[in-house]
Amino acid sequence: METGTFKVKSGLAQMLKGGVIMDVTTPEQAKIAEEAGACAVMALERVPSDIRAAGGVARMADPTIIEKIMKVVSIPVMAKCRIGHFVEAQILESMGVDYIDESEVLTPADESFHVWKHDFKVPFVCGCRDLGEALRRIGEGAAMIRTKGEAGTGNIVEAVRHMRSVMGSVRRVQSMSADELSAYAKEINAPLELVLELHKTGKLPVVNFAAGGVATPADAALMMQLGADGVFVGSGIFKSSDPAAMAKAVVKAVTHYKDAKVLAEISKGLGDAMPGLDIKQIEPDKLISRRGW
């Protein structure tokens, strides 16, 4: 089988469907995530809330940290590169990471272009706020899409906004007549062939995860009920008062997202969730979700 084709890469991402991907900064955290049932881990130097607090320029993690995490877990390991920084992506691919997240959580390296992901054999995940952004990233070769949300806030409101926007637009495309599709593709600045495919199949050609602000099992279940294929949890696990318990509860919430009784049971006794931020109190130029185009 030919490796590195879009079909192969998007197929690999499909294997994560129904799972939880957790941000980790140490091998110990990676083991906690794996034991809790995470389907993959995201290897980082700092979780998004710490990146937000520190300010300055956030770059790809030290390869040593990523390698240490890769050695201790058997589940897939993801790592982040900056938007447009194809050399960071080349480095991560050479290290053998399983997926690369071209992430707005890091400081963008290019304000005009994202990484051309078709040049890589490793699958990429990218964030989006709406259908146009999702289809532009898929057109560049992204094998997996996620909401941007507002990372590091513990506030789910932006992830909800982005998921509702994408899913609402998917339904809108389904209801369009064929002669409307070209104009709509132009309106949302998306590749026409992907809009046509969406109209035909009724769904995105790649998995669509929720990310950015997931802090509780209820948050995770909310995103699943809104149509997410799975959930990324960044600061929400290891900034909570009991990370191991929170990690297990979020995994169960994604599995049993429609069962309110199970959700009530697993939400008991978890201690404090991560401290949250009110999105309205963040200055517009400090909003991470606005990075990317």
Swiss-Prot record:
Report the catalytic activity. Answer: aldehydo-D-ribose 5-phosphate + D-glyceraldehyde 3-phosphate + L-glutamine = pyridoxal 5'-phosphate + L-glutamate + phosphate + 3 H2O + H(+)
Active site location: 80
GO annotation terms (biological process): amino acid metabolic process; pyridoxal phosphate biosynthetic process; pyridoxine biosynthetic process
- Could you state a single Gene Ontology molecular function term? pyridoxal 5'-phosphate synthase (glutamine hydrolysing) activity
Q: Which Gene3D superfamilies match?
A: Aldolase class I
Cysteines joined through disulfide linkages: none
Q: What's the superkingdom here?
A: Bacteria
Enzyme Commission numbers on file: 4.3.3.6
**Top-level EC class, please?**
lyase
Task: Write the record's keywords in alphabetical order, separated by commas.
Answer: Lyase, Pyridoxal phosphate, Schiff base
Q: Which residues bind D-glyceraldehyde 3-phosphate?
A: 164
Alphabetized Pfam families for the sequence:
SOR_SNZ
- Binding sites annotated in the UniProt record for D-ribose 5-phosphate: 23, 152, 213, 234-235
Residue spans crossing the bilayer = none
Could you confirm whether the keyword Zinc-finger appears in this record? no
Family per record: Belongs to the PdxS/SNZ family.
Which HAMAP family is this protein grouped with?
PdxS
Subunit record text:
In the presence of PdxT, forms a dodecamer of heterodimers.
The record describes the protein's role as: Catalyzes the formation of pyridoxal 5'-phosphate from ribose 5-phosphate (RBP), glyceraldehyde 3-phosphate (G3P) and ammonia. The ammonia is provided by the PdxT subunit. Can also use ribulose 5-phosphate and dihydroxyacetone phosphate as substrates, resulting from enzyme-catalyzed isomerization of RBP and G3P, respectively.
Can you name this protein? Pyridoxal 5'-phosphate synthase subunit PdxS
Q: What is the lineage of its organism?
A: Bacteria, Bacillati, Chloroflexota, Dehalococcoidia, Dehalococcoidales
Q: What's the name of its gene?
A: pdxS
